[in-house]
Amino acid sequence: MLRVFEAFAGYGSQRMALRNIGIDFEVVGISEIEGDVLQSYAAIHSDFLEKRQRIDDYVPEDNEEMISYLEEINVPLDYKTFENRAKKLKLPKLKDMYLANKLIKNYGDIQRIDPTILPDFDLFTYSFPCQDISVAGYQ
């Protein structure tokens, strides 16, 4: 089985491509910082929607623990100010964000990842930046 790390994962198009061509693989981790995209990834590629129905069974009671975890991986990130938005999330969204990141094994901001803590992988893949946030090309 191919062990995959998916950087700049977006909604998981690289994962979808591997599935579509019949590759036997396991995603051992991802790197993504956009909050809403992460929840989409979790809804598509995990049992996020099912677990969300009983979310209190899967998240800590302590809000600060959830915030600390999200700040540590720098999720969600505000692209205009490059500030972490975890403290600004209202409780339902904070719980959703925490659960989604845990389920999909998100290591968060690629600039902050300690490579020594990454799981072993055979394939490192990535997606290109979303056009609405890329600084490349005509401005």
Question: Which residues does each PLM region occupy?
Answer:
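Conserved active-site and SAM-binding loop architecture
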Residues: 1-139
